[in-house]
Amino acid sequence: RPNDNIGLTIFAGEAFTQCPLTVDHGVLLNLFNGIKGDIAQRGLIEDGTAIGMGVANAISRLKDSKAKSKVIILLTDGSNNRGDISPLTAAEIAKQFGIRVYTIGVGTNGTAPYPMQTYAGVQYVNVPVEIDEQTLTQIAGTTNGNYYRATSNSKLKEVYEEIDKLEKTKLNVKEFSKREEAYQLYALIAFICILLEIVLRNTVLKKIP
């Protein structure tokens, strides 16, 4: 889907836009790869899990769009414990703006390695992990989306493929020529903001086989 506008919001105890909406997916990928799992431990962002703030940040990027399909994909491995906006309040706001939220709980309940700042530098310790599936299901239901559970990389890939099939919008392409050069004018068909809890790459994704 090379013509989709995609943005990236990351969150821990607070949320910010890592990449605004863009069709330049190479730039998006570079910014995604630049995320460091210990960003909270280095004091660059408040620690915790602010799901509501993450959704609200994505809404602010999507709410004025005239696109037929406006989607947020919320990816998290925990439960909300920070932020001024509750996840369900954020879901109601998304609904008002016609934004559908697909929620994905990744990993398994139990423990997972988490980066901690020590006198010797950042070290990983096992901390309890519990996915709030009830809240994630409610967020999806409120916005006419779906909740998915991904316990492996292969399952996560399947989830994204299913969402891709659900979010199909007819694309009208106009072609015109000038000085014997052909151009394609692509319509913007979907805005997708992927919310990524910043610890995923160094916690959950480490334990997923």
Predicted regions and their residues:
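Membrane-embedded segments
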Residues: 1-69, 85
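Sec/Tat-exported extracytoplasmic proteins
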Residues: 1-4, 32-39, 55-66, 76, ...
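Solvent-exposed loop/turn segments at secondary-structure junctions
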Residues: 13-17, 38, 78-81, 107-111, ...
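Juxtamembrane amphipathic/hinge helix adjacent to a transmembrane helix
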Residues: 146, 150-183
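C-terminal signal-anchor/stop-transfer transmembrane helix together with its immediate cytosolic
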Residues: 169-209
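Short, hinge-like loop/turn segments at secondary-structure boundaries
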Residues: 24-27, 119-122, 165-168
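VWA/integrin I-like adhesion module and closely mimicked acidic/polar interface patches used
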Residues: 42-46, 60, 69-71, 78-142
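A structural signal for isolated positions on well-ordered beta-strands in alpha/beta enzyme cores
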Residues: 7-9, 71-73, 100-102, 148
